[in-house]
């Protein structure tokens, strides 16, 4: 069965807001990571947009071993209090991995 990838992108008005939420998200994710791995998450990446003037974006890319792992992990993620008091525009997109290139 194909793996599933979920991407979370968050856009902020200021660098300060991005940095404040970034710290919160990473601390919360660190507390969840063992359970997510147990539920079938196989990789996680996190990044900050660079080389774009006046754009403040975070992205998280999570990969799950299959659709069942995706479902179980997303239930945990969605039930978590991510402390969303800082304004942002958020997008979640999910994909079936149909091709991969490992260098």
Q: Where on the chain are the PLM-derived regions?
A:
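A common structural junction motif
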Residues: 78-85
